[in-house]
Amino acid sequence: MATAGVWFRKCLRLHDNEALVKAVATAKDVVPFFILDPHFDKSKVGVNRFNFLLESLKDLDEQLRARKSRLLVFQGQPEEVFAELFSGKGPCGRLTHLFFEKDTEPYARLRDARVAQLAKDSGVHLETFSGHTLLDVDATVAKPGFKPPISMKSIQNIATAAGPIRAPLDVPKIPPLSVEGFQVPSIGEIYAVEPSSQGFPGGEQEALRRLAQVCADVDYVCRFEKPKTASTGRPKSPWEPSTTGLSPYLKFGCLSVRSAWHAFDQCMRGRSHSQPPQSLHGQILFREMFYLLGAAVPNFDQDQQNSMCKVIPWGNDPELLAAWQEGRTGYPFIDALMRQLNQTGFMHHLGRHAVACFLTRGDLWQNWTAGRDVFDKLLLDSDWAVNNGNWLWLAGVAPFSAPYFRIYDPCPGPKSSLNAEQTGEFVKHYVPELKDMSAKYIYKPWTAPLAEQKKAGCIIGQDYPKPIVDHQKAREANLARFKAALDSGALPEKFGGAKGDPGPMTSFSGGKGGKGDKGGKRAASPDAGGRKRRWGKGAKGDTLAGG
């Protein structure tokens, strides 16, 4: 009698789950399970993201129990877990079939290869499916003539050639499962600190609720242009995301990317709407682009031997990195964003622009890989391909980066492309030392007269740090360093991409090089006729997959 295991990994959902559908169609008995792999320990995963994972597992278990099944949660090395499941020593008899979705991260490839060999040696039928992206990443990269995409135009061409996106799959009728034990652990069993009460509840049901809430406002979906969203949240709540807030749910697969795509498409159908890269479809396409780059480019996560990375002699100062990570640089906007990240696991994409630029080419001249590691641990929506792609982009070292001389001002004014609210409420929420500081000085408190500082109960240099660097001096020095590196041959041997294809621009697109971050106009090309475009029309702009 066939017993099929469904290994939940990055598709923590019942809807649009091809592995689950195939398992139900193949075997009378189906065992849904998740493995808490010690590879992803506390040194690599922050408490907020781990809590989101556990909440997602609990939600999945609740939905399965409502169908008289359940989720088994095993803890240990995957190979050791499967050795028992394949031999019949596990709690549910011997697995004869194993189904799961593909994972293209480097560690996952090695892990899955070992599991596949173990399955083969044990006579277990194994089948994998592409469930975390619109495109089958490996199949796309393997096609003759494939070139790594470095712009919206190139990823649109690849996606269009792949054909229409299939509709999401319905939840199948899952057979009952009666096995005791192997419960979802509590966060307190793993971490000594409590997760934030702010942020996002994990789970498929919450993901679908949020998607429905977003799509209920059809005008919002049609008008969405990510560069125009506020980095400091909605007007009524400066710390509430001004974007969809769906990125953590896509990261964990609580929400199918196909479901999101088709839901947005339904809203836009027959209406004038924004276009990629600024649109919601554009956000998904950039995610696809980074997944393809991560799979196709060797050492995509490194600053050496990476064809997508200019070789820059970055500094290595642990004190500067720690000040940035902990939100004590003396620049309130930067510090508020980093404290938001530490407390909630979330940061708006323009905030990510600001802090990444500040750490690297803008002010502190630290290696982008150090910032990448901080984001990788703390972000709820941290995703290997997307995180590396964005840091390459924002550090100015990738072929799809903006010109390196376009640097964000860490003290954003009302005309800044960082779209920061000017009342200071966001800063005051996350940097309470400045809660009584006048809005006039909130982004540059060191310029406030001493009387103002005393009135606010915050003496700069005592109650809140002085700026860790002088922005203007650091900016000029870093521009000279970057130019010198380029002049000395920092360009890798091969960047790839088509001649004349500029790649995605940041929110500076269209502006001439110069001081500040004013930039130029952002292009938009709405489909005024309301005609449906499968992949959308390309346009310059900026985006960040996540946030």
Task: Pin down the residues of each PLM region.
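N-terminal beta-strand-loop-alpha-helix module at the start
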Residues: 1-69, 483, 493, 503
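An acidic- and aromatic-residue-enriched active-site/binding cleft used to recognize and process polar
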Residues: 9-11, 35-37, 76, 103-105, ...
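Residues at alpha-helix caps and immediate loop-helix transition turns in enzyme cores, especially N-
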Residues: 16-19, 111-112, 367, 371
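Conserved short loop/turn motifs at secondary-structure junctions
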Residues: 46-47, 74-79, 83, 101-106, ...
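Beta-rich, aromatic/charged-enriched effector core domains that present basic-aromatic interfaces
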Residues: 70, 78-209, 389-394, 398, ...
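Glycine/tryptophan-enriched, flexible segments
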Residues: 145-308, 421, 425-531, 536, ...
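Active-site-proximal binding-pocket segments
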Residues: 239-433, 439
